[in-house]
Amino acid sequence: MYQYHCLNPIAEVGLKNFNGNYAKTDKIEDADAVLVRSAVMHDMNLPEKLCVIGRAGAGVNNIPLGKCSEQGIAVFNTPGANANGVKELVIAGLLLASRDIVGGIHWVQSERQNEEIEKLAEKQKKQFAGGEIKGKKLGIIGLGAIGILVANAAVALGMEVYGYDPFISVEAAWKLSRDVHHTTDVNEIYRECDYITIHVPLMDSTKGMIGADAIALMKPSVVVLNFARGPLVDQKAIVEALKTNRIHKYVTDFPTTDLANLKNAIVIPHLGASTKESEDNCAVMAVKEIQDYLENGNIHNSVNYPNCDMGVCKDAMRVTIIHRNIPNMLTKFTAAFGDLGINIEKLTNVTRGEYGYVMIDLGNVADEEEIEKIRAIEGVLRVRTMK
């Protein structure tokens, strides 16, 4: 029996995927798995029993990845599960910024008691006029699950789309419209585009990537959109640019006091993935990843360990080992099982950065005392068994 703990409310449609071998617990110290959305885990004590954390969403900056990796805890996210919800809000952001829809709505509300509002609207509507996005240049920084959907939707709306992503995968590239101009120079996007939207993960290398230097290259008429992570855009630089009309507008899903007090900032209360469909998709995906890991040892969409899949074990026992990526580890594992007289039927070893992951299917069952000898090998972080 496996136990799971939810740090945030998780969509019931996802939790229903847990079968009778799973039970919900209110105590994290009893949990084999944790499901989380936005709860900050950095100051939490992670119990020894905990094997896996499933993030029902894409960003993992609320999870202590270093601590998890050292404790042998696999961390999964759900890339693409909320992509359509975010894409739709980005398109809405483009439209809100191109025409003063927000200002027009506020004006109507201010005149709601005026019996002449219908006639007055015809006189006042000019102040809320704007332009169309068709034919305008949209620059997309980051062509992952969300960036690709935004690019393809913008092409369908008649925009001239530029994409920048030096790390785009082959799989992602196949999904991208052939009408997207792929640039290898992000500065081309800063210089040429009328709208710029950012869709990259928050890392040390991307924090503040849209700052004073990038803004200096942009057109004064540019609209910058950020539905990825707040700190990707330098707060001080963007506020100064808005105050001095160095850029036209900033549309963001991450409210701050400074931005909320600027008329040329359109600030949304983090609604990007706040759709029922997104929450359901993320929950279902996270639960399935957790199940496959706990029951079969397979890793998909881990952010701290390498992906690895050997399907369902058809031999006597499966052993999985999380270890440091140092020389001779695989030799030590195979030698140890050989010394124990246990035959290895199948084996996969993959690495990612400082860590490695081994899946071994055995011809006969190893008892706990024999497994302890594997755990005792220097460099081993966690050993799990399943039948």
Language model region names:
Residues 304-387:
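A conserved regulatory-domain signal marking ACT and ACT-like small-molecule sensing domains
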Residues 79-137, 301-303:
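Phosphate-binding beta-alpha-beta segment of Rossmann-like dinucleotide-binding domains, i.e.
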Residues 143-144:
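Glycine-rich Rossmann-fold phosphate-binding loop(s) that bind the pyrophosphate
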